[in-house]
UniProtKB/Swiss-Prot annotation:
Native organism taxonomy: Eukaryota, Viridiplantae, Streptophyta, Embryophyta, Tracheophyta
Keywords: Activator, DNA-binding, Nucleus, Transcription, Transcription regulation
Gene field: NFYC5
Organism: Arabidopsis thaliana (Mouse-ear cress)
Spans annotated as Disordered: 166-186
Localization: Nucleus
Protein name: Nuclear transcription factor Y subunit C-5
GO molecular function: DNA binding; DNA-binding transcription factor activity; protein heterodimerization activity
Cellular component terms (Gene Ontology): nucleus
Function: Stimulates the transcription of various genes by recognizing and binding to a CCAAT motif in promoters.
One Pfam entry name: CBFD_NFYB_HMF
Amino acid sequence: MENNNNNHQQPPKDNEQLKSFWSKGMEGDLNVKNHEFPISRIKRIMKFDPDVSMIAAEAPNLLSKACEMFVMDLTMRSWLHAQESNRLTIRKSDVDAVVSQTVIFDFLRDDVPKDEGEPVVAAADPVDDVADHVAVPDLNNEELPPGTVIGTPVCYGLGIHAPHPQMPGAWTEEDATGANGGNGGN
């Protein structure tokens, strides 16, 4: 039976790299045993749905492979957009452009932050770049406001002294590398 529904993923017709990626992914042997995403985390996410009572053994592996292919496709499309703009780095604006121009990524439109087109300034020293955005108290006054510590906000902004706060349930490096006694979340 022929499927005339265009809602499924089609290989892109305009770019050889994307065509090659999808043709290899669709016709090749999908090795779902080697995965990039932690399977235990995927199982936990699947179990959050109250309608899910049992999970087949291969379902988390297939979902991991699907996520890997999805991220790779979005990254490749963003990279191509960055190259079209004569840049070597993928920016928010590249991901935003890909999401807004590609029909299959419509579901991400509300979740990908819009790039406001902020001017790009090349900073030689990252501390100088952060210091421009931090309010510095007037040092001509002998007394500083209570609770003011000079130097700490700049260092904290760079993540030197303390780790950034993490959302509850977010992945950590330990989850990805398997530092909890597992082998990468398997």
